[in-house]
Amino acid sequence: ITGCIGLTSSQCLEEFTDVHSLPHHDYGKGGRGWRDLWQDCLALLIMEPEQVRQMLIDNFGGVRFDGTNATIIGSKQGEFIADRNNITRVWMDHGAWPYLTTELYMQQTGDVEFLVEENSYFKDPQVCRGEEKDMIWNDEQGNKQLAENNEVYAGTVLEHMLIQHLTAFYDVGEHNHIRLRGADWNDGLDMAAKRGESVAFTALYGGNLKNLAKDIKAYAEKTGNETVLLAKELLILLNVDKTVFDRIDEKKQVLDAYCETVKHTISGEKVNVRCDELCSILDSMGDWIGEHIRTTEWTTDKDGDGWFNGYYDNSGNAVEGDFPTGIRMMLTGQVFTVMADVATDEQVVAIAKSADKYLYDEAIGGYRLNTDFKEVKTDLGRLFGFAFGHKENGAVFSHMATMYANSLYHRGYAKEGYKVINSLFKHCDNYSKSGIYPGIPEYVSQRGRGMYHYLTGAASWMLLTVLNEMYGVKGEYGALKLKPQLLKEQFENGKASATCMFNGKNITVTYKNDKALDAGQYSVKEIYIDGNKYGDCDTVLKEDVMKLNDTVNIVAILD
């Protein structure tokens, strides 16, 4: 992140593009993956947003009609290549990331019409979410999904995201959480394909469903369009009675019926779906997920301190809790239950306490990815073959730690969020401890050394967290919302400022905290633009943002 701030955006883009081809001998052969594609765009949205719109549209071309996606990105924008090493593998988290980037884009720009932009779908032999092969497909048919008339089918961005989320919603295991399959964000959880479930990412999908409903409502209000066009096949996933949500076998039947229908070609027919009805369906799905996790996955230790179980293993057992060998806690399940508003405020407080108790280690820069399971857990993943404190087995993993900070700020817990960021910063800024130049490594090892220090996912989330959450400079459907959560000690002489691009304007926002108030005690009461009072408010309307000079100074009074 420190390097990127000092670079031009084009240099940053080059660094992003080649990030996984750097000369670490044990890091792999290089090349970008699906998550890289979307998370690199997060940072670009802040630094050079005009590039991003078409890039996002092109990226959606990697989605399959069964909700999975191509896992290797070609050298050209929008180019996708089939299975890694010709091995079929499905990462269950992949469907969630495109929405997060698209949501940030729409909030920054107000471009909700982006939802109805169109692109094709990726096609290869992999069908039924990686469980079957399309035996009548061949290379001559190309890598784009065809309709029955042999024409390439194109659907909206909204349709792509709906397919990703709806198929995941029905793809559940025996505890009614989304199946882990080949792994989730944690690639090391790769040995529970049959019975594994990811409660952590089920929470994220649930939060996305509810936020997508808000976006559809905003689209309908802005455009006056009461309906959206969707592929006819999606009705299989939408026209389902809510009572089915509790019944695992029936959910699987819904998914199987859909996957069988879209196995080779699709009809090409589209139907109008009412926006209000679609929003209601998505809300009900998101609400169901949240309630299901809250009522089934909360676990506590002997002292009554609690957190969420984030996974089920290949034996069908909950992974986290108070075990005879010790406490088993993983950070991922806490991050996404907090971020997706699944956790109640009381649960957020409890999670932060438990994370401090079991995961925090100041000597290595903060919050570990997990506690020591004291077992090579072959019914969950290869990560347990690493020594504890290395790689995915209990290291301080910068990406997840940064997302933990983001989730805490999102819920208004600024002191707790700042502790995460500051612990990581102080460690990595100290060469004698981290052994690297200042920056964000992939992880911090048991010895405190920063490892693999070119990671754009962590860097993107650090930019987002510091700018959008800590400094509170964020978009609200194109309007400029100022909602800082800076601690009292972060102000110098009562002032704190940040400079960034917003809707094509180079803005510097300066907060004045003359009363030395702490985060949670103040809000923005007045806004001044280039010395002139704008209003007694915390938001600059989109139409007024567009009228601003190319470079502008904004002063916000806190009280």
Residue ranges and their predicted role:
Residues I1-D559:
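Acidic, mature catalytic/reactive cores of soluble proteins
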